[in-house]
Structure formats: structure tokens, C-alpha cells
Amino acid sequence: DADGTHLLPLGRKLRGLASRPNQFDGNVIDWRSGDGWVLMSRDFVPEADATGSNIRGTGSRDGLGVELVDTVTGKAQLVERPDSEATDYLADGQGNIRIKEVMPRDGTGLLTGETIYRYHPTGGGGGGWQPFSRARANSHDALEPLAVDGTRDVAFATRGLNGRLALYSVKLDGSMATELVASNPEVDVTSVVTIGRRGRVIGATYVTDRRQTDYFDPDYRKLAAALARALPRTPLIRFVGANADESQLLVFAGSDVDPGTYYRFTKATRRLDALVGARPALGGVAMGEMKAVRFPAADGTMVPAYLTLPPGGAARGLPAIVMPHGGPSYRDEWGFDWLVQFFAASGYAVIQPQYRGSSGYGDGWFANNAFRSWEQAISDV
């Protein structure tokens, strides 16, 4: 309920006879029209005594499928049969599953290193899944879909362009007509911005020293600029959600020294009301500023990094912590980081190198995720 009572878990729980472990109990892929039903992708785990049998029902189903789930009762209807090689599904915000991601295995059960994308063309027509693209591991030659916008009947997908990931729109009417919609000459375009229950795509994001957003929707472009002027100390502004008609928006604003606050913005009155802080216990606590820097590697290559110094303290003679990010396919970015701030508050300078092998800087820097070039990546650290 709205007051937080009568919680109903929607995930699929494992039974006692499950044949394998499962760390994923479901993900909402389409919120539909607000009728109380949602589309959820769910990992079906067969029962140990049903494997290979002809037992009917859910006990022998295996793999990722999609169910239509009643959020009031928890009852579910199967709408996409489980596939043991499926890894993701994308819906169009109008209750339709449009794209399926599959990672096939060879005869020994090992992944082939290929990802296959299929789609349902507009209107279906009973033809089943149609080819969308085939992508090879650590290659950006193929279209890799991120989202589907049902209001325009297009998928948004990334593909390599001049050594960087760019964003394209792809018509789902069967023509697969493709159009470039966003790119950056220095870094990869990494994600799209969606709004509302239907997941309408309104922009694309990429990270230079800070995360940037190119808004396709002119109204949201103007609104984002207005919010940036109204909240100059928290420039990391993003639209988190909206009500059905987008008359009220949930907005987040933060920075490197501010964990952030969630606001409700009412379009009719242009009123911005603070709702809750992301980390209220840190209110009034001094934070160290995060600065984008460059330093020369052993071979002279300039490596991007972030440097955070203790707040209000000396800038020289400090003990330092070098904190490389994890992976695979990852990078740090400017903004609040609780672990960095913990070390800075303890008197350390914190350096976060974006070593060769980090994602987001293009194919040349990614270097196949430092595969067979780990010595170079480690030397950058």
C-alpha cells in the first residue's frame, strides 16, 4: 500500500527442489498503463526431480522468460516461454515485448562469445522473432539495443563510430531503417534517458570528466537547463521518474560534495519541492572536492584520473590511496563516492586512475578490456 504496509514480493522464489541456484528473482521490464499489472522477466529454475521429464507445469521450465504479474494478488500469466540461453528482454512501454537478447552456448555448454538480438516487428504478423543483430564479445561493429520507445516504434542501440560508441535509432516496422542520433568524438555514448511509465526516450548520456546529457526532447532540454540554474551547487541533475501524464516529475540533484536530494517538480506551477536526501546523516559534513586531472604514464601517455583531497586541509605532504575501479567494462566518474569521502575525511588524498582498459573512452583506450595488455593497464595504476 501507499503507506508502506502489506508488502507483496513479486519475485519468483526458488523451491526446495531447485536444480540450480538463482540470484535473480525478477525484473520489471514494462510498467504498462497503470492497470495494476506489470511485465516481469523472470529466471525459471527447473525442479531437480522434473529435469528431463514430461511433467507439465512450471517445474520443468528452465531459463529467462516473461510473465504478466498482478501487483495486487501476485498472480502471474506466462507471456514469453523461458529460454535457457536468453539473457534479457526489452519491452516498448505499451505492454509488448519487442527485443530478446540471447547468449548461445556450444556443445560443451560454454558461451560462444556471441550475443544475438532478435525483435518482434510492428504488428507481429505471427512470424515470431526476427533477426536484429549479432554482436561479438568486445566488438562494437553490431547494433546493441539499449531501449525501445513504443511511442515512436523504434529501438535505440549503440554501435561503433570512429572508434567510439554512438547511439542510433532503429525502426521496428520491419525495415530496420537506422539513423544516427547521438555521438561524441572523445568518449562513448553509454546510455539513454527515459521518462514516465512508458519509458519514452528523451535523451542520451556520455561521460567526459562529468556525465553529460544530450536531450532530444526540447521541453526537457529547457527544463534541465532551468533546474541547473536553480540548483547551481548540485549540477548532476537527472529525471528519475514521472506520473502518468508527466505533469509531476521526480528529480535528483547532487554533486561531488553533496550525496544528493530528491525533488518533486510540478510543471503547472513550476514548483520544486525537496522530498528526501540521499544520505541525510551526512548533512553539514564537510566533503573533499573531486577534481579531474591527468598524469603521465611510464610511456608518457596522459592518463585521466580523479583526485580528492581532505576537506579544508593541506594539499601537500599527504598520504595517498590509489583506488583503481573494478570491472569488467567500467570507469569512475565525477560525483559523490562514499568510500572516497571516507578516506578523504581520514586525511588521505585519493587518486582514481582511469587506466587503459577502462570503458567509456573509446576502443583504443578500452583495449579489449585490457585483455593481453594487463601489464600496460597495471603500469598506469
Regions found by a protein language model. Name each.
Residues 1-249, 254-258, 265-268, 285:
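Beta-propeller folds
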Residues 11, 205, 276-279, 354:
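Residues at the C-termini of beta-strands that transition into short coil/loop
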Residues 86, 139, 163-166, 188-190, ...:
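Flexible loop/turn segments at secondary-structure boundaries
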Residues 144, 153, 165-166, 247, ...:
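Structural beta-strand/beta-sheet cores of well-ordered domains, especially the beta-sheet scaffolds
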Residues 258-293:
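An N-terminal hydrophobic leader/cap segment in hydrolases
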Residues 281-381:
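Cap/lid segment of the alpha/beta-hydrolase catalytic domain
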